[in-house]
A protein has these predicted regions:
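Short acidic (Asp/Glu) and glycine-rich catalytic loops that position anionic groups and cofactors
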Residues: 87-94, 139-141, 200-205
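Conserved alpha/beta-hydrolase "acid-adjacent" motif
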Residues: 152-158
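Short beta-strand/loop motif that positions the catalytic acidic residue
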Residues: 139, 145-147, 151
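A conserved mid-domain beta-alpha-beta active-site/ligand-binding segment of alpha/beta enzyme cores
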Residues: 201-217, 221-225
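Catalytic histidine neighborhood in serine/cysteine hydrolases
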Residues: 112, 162, 166-203
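Mobile cap/lid helix-loop segments that gate and shape the active-site cleft of serine hydrolases
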Residues: 97-134, 141-142
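Alpha/beta-hydrolase-fold enzymes
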Residues: 4-108, 119, 229-263
Length: 263
């Protein structure tokens, strides 16, 4: 999203009124444990392997993230299912999480080098996307930035770092739990807490922000909903039919074949 907005800004286009970043890395200075595994040799190997073509298998990507929390996401099921013969209980979030997708090899190689290795997105003009030089200083629009306190993929400090990069009016909110459960937290469940800091105050260190933030019970969704109302257009009636005109007809009932297809 950040690179798409930067491309549009470079072309003088501003079709977006506001943007929301959920557990997102833009500044890759703090990438947590993943930083241990990504160095020049690893990236060069991936560039040689698939930089000109091919795919990164979705299962390989899923395994990488699972082994960042091996006790919960790997060995827990080895012991319970393989050793004890227990059937894992249904878990909607993990079912969704297991639906991985393949990545184009050239994109994956580009991403590794320009983000995790060289952190080029925060260096004006260093990275190029769709023929345009990326300069996030031009992405001057209201943004809502959410980070999860126990996130093992996007550390809270990494999510917070976006407040130091994006120039527009910002709101940063921290939620309890991790990368997925922190985000998917419907208010009706009345679970967990979220933290909100002073309006417009973003010290450089995330720990300083946390020290002064106010803890509020329940989901952060209610805060986000109010923020969106202030940046959205007028409400309009929902369309009565699917598709749009003769050119964009509905293909089949939701959710569609692509949702059920395996990578």
């Amino acid at each position: 999203l950040s690179t798409a907005l930067a491309v549009l800004a470079a072309r003088g286009e501003k079709p977006v009124a506001s943007a929301t970043f959920l557990t997102t890395l833009i500044d890759f200075t703090d990438t947590g444990i993943l930083d241990v595994f990504i160095d020049e040799n690893f990236v060069k190997f991936r560039e040689m392997q698939m930089g000109k073509g091919g795919l990164l298998k979705g299962q390989d990507l899923a395994s990488t993230f699972s082994f960042l929390r091996p006790n919960d996401l790997v060995w827990n099921y080895v012991v319970g299912n393989y050793l004890k013969g227990e059937t894992p209980p249904p878990f909607d979030l993990l079912y969704w999480n297991s639906d991985s997708t393949n990545l184009p090899g050239p994109f994956y190689a580009w991403y590794l080098r320009n983000t995790y290795l060289e952190n080029n997105l925060v260096k004006p003009g260093k990275a190029r996307v769709c023929g345009e030089k990326i300069d996030l200083r031009q992405v001057d629009l209201p943004v809502y930035i959410y980070g999860s306190r126990e996130d093992h993929i996007v550390p809270i400090g990494g999510a917070y770092a976006s407040t130091q990069v994006l120039p527009g009016k910002k709101r940063f909110v921290m939620g309890a739990s991790g990368h997925i459960a922190g985000v998917i937290n419907p208010p009706a469940a009345k679970k967990r807490s979220h933290w909100i800091g002073a309006e417009g105050k973003f010290p450089k260190d995330v720990n300083d922000w946390i020290a002064s933030a106010q803890e509020l019970p329940g989901s952060w969704w209610t805060d986000w909903s109010q923020w969106l109302k202030g940046h959205a257009g007028k409400q309009i009636p929902a369309p009565k039919g699917y598709g749009k005109g003769a050119k964009f007809k509905a293909i089949e009932p939701a959710p569609g074949r692509y949702v059920k297809a395996k990578a």
